[in-house]
């Protein structure tokens, strides 16, 4: 298995190594120190945890039709790669199969289908399984969180969504082919919840043995990347 990596060597300042592990989690090393999740580094840069997903992924809205108990989502020709369709494309406008499973397709054909009127697709429940929720889904009245952003959609998830009569769910644009779930997966294993926690974690790596202080931690981090 190929493990990808990159190294940023500035004219001045700290070296930054970025690398995948065998589970496709993305880590980074500052000045070749102990590795940390890349999402920890992003949070230390001031990006909030709930902003990281939207920074790297688009969002699709899946709408549940109570009429036929199927899901409707916009058809994006750009998401189509050259090859055979794994699932039939069903036109949500009339419920008819626009292109059968196993048919060879490419971006040009997909664009023509879109121009000819294929704007939305109709999907079965199983076509959502394995995808990821893009935003927290909450009870507007009580504030109860039903599902958290980045949660993987399972058959149990779909069953609960229907029980709660939730008609729309935001889903991350991750297909495992054009766009991988690497950042999402890394965020799931990252225990830091805020920029403050992240910068303290990095300070512990850079200055092991020294008691962490938030103000000092920010000063050290900023001196590595933002001060000449």
Task: Please place each PLM-identified region on the residue numbering.
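N-terminal non-catalytic structural scaffold regions of very large proteins
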Residues: 1-228
